[in-house]
């Protein structure tokens, strides 16, 4: 077996900026205060590794001079200001649709995609136990907005031709009076451009 870091990524890098203290420096027991880091993770995957073969169409992704496929994701990190006071463990959350929900579910905190206040800390469960909390994006079709985490992904192609196919979208009217939807079905999600304006080829059920 190979180390997971080699399987998933090579030549990775982080571009982070410190955005100050969580909850204006509130102390969480012996762990102390937390700091907020925001930025991007720049990653590479080897399409030839068997462990990456489950990624759909990875064999059609554009490779760089190293033979790997480059992509980037936004990251949001909350960590002890003094890392030596933390527990040395990372709590990683893939946010659904780019949203940050770990503090809401584990700390009973007020929901927020930009956690920074005492209300966003909730009961402090994860903080008092010294976890470093990391969020990253996993969907490449999200639109920027509402502090959602987004990605920068390459486009897979058959040679020079774009890959096309049938797209399935679900429309859910979650509130009374809802009459219009984007083609993607979600205002936060990018719609796929059509290859044909012939509506007879479309199906609505």
Label each region the model flagged:
Residues 9-205:
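C-terminal His-loop and adjacent cap/lid subdomain of alpha/beta-hydrolase
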